[in-house]
Amino acid sequence: MADQLIRATAAGGGIRAVGVITTDLTAEAQRKHGLSFVATTALGRSMAAGLLLASSMKKEGSRVNLRIRSAGPLGGLMVDAGLDGTVRGYVEHPAIEIEPNTQGLPDVGRAIGPGYLHVMRDVGYGQPYTSTVELVNGEIGDDVAYYLASSEQTPSAILLGVYLDRQGVEAAGGLLIQVLPQAARDPELVSLLESRISHLKGFTQLLRSGKDLPEILEDLLGDLDLTILAEPRSLRFFCPCTHQRMLGALKIFGAPELRDMIAKDQGAEATCEFCSEVYQASIEELEELISDLETAA
């Protein structure tokens, strides 16, 4: 199943649902960064969460940043996701591996450890909206659900999953169910949803069973006037970094430091944190940057 996002409503518009398949883009992140099993799972869940949050934004070009700063072995992570379906991200210590949990699965909570989740929503103008919450357990899903409940006052359930073996990422994705204000006043509806979600066996198991997103939503909300909205949106791992952007970033070092790079290294090398692309700057390019800086001074 191709990476995609679908939206749906139920209960007369009182329930909002968004589902994403992120298998290929999670595999791409694993390949680009050389991620361990537990780092792949942590970043894969976080990228799915970022795309789910970005889906609620209205203005073209809007993006959501998720940053986790924590004390665990992974050292935190960063995700940048857009309404357009693009996402990128990285883990501070991508190669770290730890013992699996008692179920034999990657122990994301222990690998992340205690810390904070910072969420920034940027619509492309004005000041971005930012919010910070303490991590609940480092498993990503519960942490994002807590952010939604505390910062946006929206009762939400978020299911995130990544399944991988030694051949790579087999399945990844997520599901966000939100009870909107008009429906949140119906305790029976809220209780019914909570019961159904609690009985799900895990999102990745549903994907591995061969069910697609509409089928999963039908099982969960089909008797509540489920409506699938429009066509699926394609998703992909994408980083806008370029050689020219790298050269622009080098200017912040200033002319003296650039001269030092020429003298000591005969050029410069920069690696993009988000996609691990390596860029080289020649002596001639550094000299041109120095000239630009001195002309502007």
UniProtKB/Swiss-Prot annotation:
Its recorded name reads 33 kDa chaperonin
The GO molecular function terms of this record are: protein folding chaperone; unfolded protein binding
Q: Which GO terms describe its biological process?
A: protein refolding
Q: Which UniProt keywords apply?
A: Chaperone, Cytoplasm, Disulfide bond, Redox-active center, Zinc
Task: Locate the coiled-coil region(s) and give their ranges.
Answer: none
Q: What does this protein do?
A: Redox regulated molecular chaperone. Protects both thermally unfolding and oxidatively damaged proteins from irreversible aggregation. Plays an important role in the bacterial defense system toward oxidative stress.
Q: Where in the cell is it found?
A: Cytoplasm
| Family recorded in the similarity comment | Belongs to the HSP33 family.
